[in-house]
């Protein structure tokens, strides 16, 4: 079996595993790497099939998490952005003893809209899957543009995300489809009631993919977790608001 690409950076006395979102790779953290590296030892990963972690096909959430867990430190804060938030959450469910704290960023335990639950309409996700096979690069570009929509630095942020994608070879369509399937079908709302490590959820007020309306719903469902909404951010708050993002993580570390 192939190994996933993994880089350690920084010299902080606390390990922080960073998991990127759909279609991207670990270069997405470049803008905050220096700042976070002074507080943490960072573990930068390309998820299986993405970036430099080549040779993997489509995976289920469980398979992806098991692959990442193989190389992970014994104890770390696990932070996942968007799709990566589901991987970090799954890690907290299957290996709670290895997760010092769980952080999800612009992520949802259930990305798909359901009755009484805001999210992405299932037909929109299905449409993305269809479009992937028709016009692969255009579809990824559209998805990236959606992530920064509404922020004061939207164009610049979208360019940053696009440069991250272009920095590595594009994931296979099969891998991207598998990621969309996870976003379309996974629902961790009930399972995550049982986690008892510190749990921080960060949202962007302007996020068009993960509606801020889920924050109060999850405050009620998971009273053991805390949420923070970054006011002028969209789906990539660590790019548009790096200072607020890094401050939230430094505060979490000092509370452990």
Curated annotation (Swiss-Prot):
Domain of life of the native organism: Bacteria
- Per its record, what are the GO molecular function terms? pimelyl-[acyl-carrier protein] methyl ester esterase activity
Coiled-coil intervals: none
Is the keyword Metal-binding in the record?
no
What GO cellular component is one of the record's annotations? Answer: cytoplasm
What's any GO biological process attached to this entry? biotin biosynthetic process
| EC number(s) reported in the record | 3.1.1.85
Q: Which reaction does it catalyse?
A: 6-carboxyhexanoyl-[ACP] methyl ester + H2O = 6-carboxyhexanoyl-[ACP] + methanol + H(+)
Boundaries of each AB hydrolase-1 domain copy?
A: 15-242
Q: Which Gene3D superfamilies match?
A: alpha/beta hydrolase (3.40.50.1820)
Q: In which pathway does it act?
A: Cofactor biosynthesis; biotin biosynthesis
Q: Which positions bind substrate?
A: 22, 82-83, 143-147, 235
Active site residues according to the UniProt entry: 82, 207, 235
What InterPro entries does the database record attribute to this sequence?
A: AB_hydrolase_1, AB_hydrolase_fold, BioH, Carboxylesterase_BioH
| Homology family | Belongs to the AB hydrolase superfamily. Carboxylesterase BioH family.
Q: Which PANTHER family does the UniProt record give?
A: HYDROLASE ALPHA/BETA FOLD FAMILY, PIMELOYL-[ACYL-CARRIER PROTEIN] METHYL ESTER ESTERASE
The entry describes its oligomerization and partners as: Monomer.
- What is the role of the protein in this entry? The physiological role of BioH is to remove the methyl group introduced by BioC when the pimeloyl moiety is complete. It allows to synthesize pimeloyl-ACP via the fatty acid synthetic pathway through the hydrolysis of the ester bonds of pimeloyl-ACP esters.
- Mind telling me what this protein is named? Pimeloyl-[acyl-carrier protein] methyl ester esterase
